[in-house]
Amino acid sequence: MLIFSMLNDKRTRENRMMSEQREDLGFDPDALRAKYREERDKRVREDANEQYIEVKGDFSHYIDDPYLDAALEREPLTDEVDVVVIGGGFGGLLSAARLREAGVERLRVIEKGGDFGGTWYWNRYPGAACDVESYIYLPLCEELGFVPKEKYTHAPEILAHSRAIAEKYDLYSNACLQTEVTGMEWLEDESRWLITTNRNDAMKSRFVVMSNGPLNRPKLPGIEGIDSFKGHTFHTSRWDYDYTGGSSEGGLDGLKDKVVGIIGTGATAVQCVPHLGESAKQLYVFQRTPSSIDVRDNTQTDPDWAKALKPGWQKARMENFNTLVSGGLADEDLVNDGWTEIIRNLLTMVNFSEAKLNPLEIAQKLELADFQKMEDIRARAQEIVDDPSTAESLKPYYRQFCKRPCFHDGYLPTFNRPSVELIDTQGKGVDKITEKGIVANGKEYELDCLIFATGFEVGTEYTRRAGYDLIGKGGVTLSEKWQDGIKTLHGMHSRGFPNVFIIQNAQSAFTVNFPHAMDEQAKHLSYIVDQCLGSNIQTVEATAEAEDAWVQEIVKLARLGQQFQESCTPGYYNNEGKPNLRTVQNGPYGAGANAFFALIKGWREEGSMEGLELN
């Protein structure tokens, strides 16, 4: 989002106080800047993303599927289809749905889970819910004649909706569930991809859509002694209800006599900690960096409102939301929630429509608006949490978009329970894990159960996160080509890997409503596949010139926000506090999602498939 690239322009360091009036603000901007730097610096680690452990080998049980009733038995496949879609989450479902709408019949989805749903198949922890309004987050609602039950619906309904999409578009009939891709090789003589799997499949496909998902591979912290704990342990994305009891709605009765520790205080922990606090005999929450916690105010869907929706309602609502959170203007705020309020507050401070401000003054006012909002977030923690020390530890000191903002009405009150204790590590993380529990701040906390709410790999190699590599033209692998940074056209095509389409945020659109971007990419790739199938085009790939130009454009635009990311507290947005040229190149399209959507739509309408080499 371009609006945030201005928040830390170099020029804001010059004469910052030109338009600041401390007596009117209620806070000291210089003091906050110093506090933000102090909090950031204590959290920066030299090992950045290397601080995390790859979940394999002795740690592979953390990614076992706990939701399978029985393992699926089938014979290996050696057939051929027109399109293979790798991944059964929203990106894969949308790609397959749009391909079906384009008339593609010989299509197969390969999914490692036991069903469709992607992140919503795996993340069934108590309290799991979408943090973007469900009426725009759940894809293809109009196509299915469906309206979610809540403004921010919970995981069971999202998973059920995923299954309904697969049913509507007949994706189960030829799907390979409980199947992991192990490799892909381009067969030059046949113009086909050979796809191998852990079930000894060796199938061929003319086109491949890679939709592995941005948050699909759990990560573990590289804490000393992580493999020594003798109690029960699991990752939140593989919640063990056999141990905890209860369901995604809570009621974790199995923990009533258990002392539980949870490492992590990001978006997942914010949703599940209230249920753990309600059920566990004792809960210790180990925190490195607090999340910003704003009001959620979830509501049930009004049946009369749902019945009155007119054709095109979801598309209009999605586009309206994306315009507003990208800093654009609209006559009406259809979603009108915490996300759009953030941007509305920023724009109100700047008042673009009336004030004649230069870029320096705009940057200053945006920064002040951000300060004010985060002051409100910190005041909310102070107001809700009874213990002053705990309240202070729960206050985030960084710009609001340094980390994904959280919205929840039950997280902060949980720390008023006598059985819940926040263990703030002052940015250092826990010291070590022992046979009995966790050592933090020099003190050992004995536990019966240890839960990792430590998120997913984001900044690691794409092929590592995917779990397989591609061998393209001339025997070059994708990992070799991308070793110094991602190289694509529109984030989707990479030269040397014909007929492959990649659904991702990198070098593509980023919006807080991920499925919207995925759908625009799905429409784009389905158009190209349809053109190829209808015109007997055997191969399609980016030209070298178009790919180079796109990478240069990505880097140029990304530099607008680089100063902002460098000032942020460590997280997956900024390579754990170590942004570099590679992370800049691997970033999204810096002009914003709306500009990207318009760009690829215009590309399709122009009709010449510029930048692609067709054979």
Q: What do these predicted ranges mean?
A:
Residues 230-238:
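Active-site-adjacent "gating/activation" loops or surface patches in catalytic cores
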Residues 260:
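Alpha/beta-hydrolase fold nucleophile elbow
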Residues 8-10, 15-83, 100-227, 242, ...:
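N-terminal FAD-binding dinucleotide-binding subdomain shared by FAD-dependent oxidases/monooxygenases
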Residues 87-91, 265-266:
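Glycine-rich Rossmann-fold phosphate-binding loop(s) that bind the pyrophosphate
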Residues 275:
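Hydrophobic/aromatic ligand-binding patch that stacks against planar heteroaromatic rings
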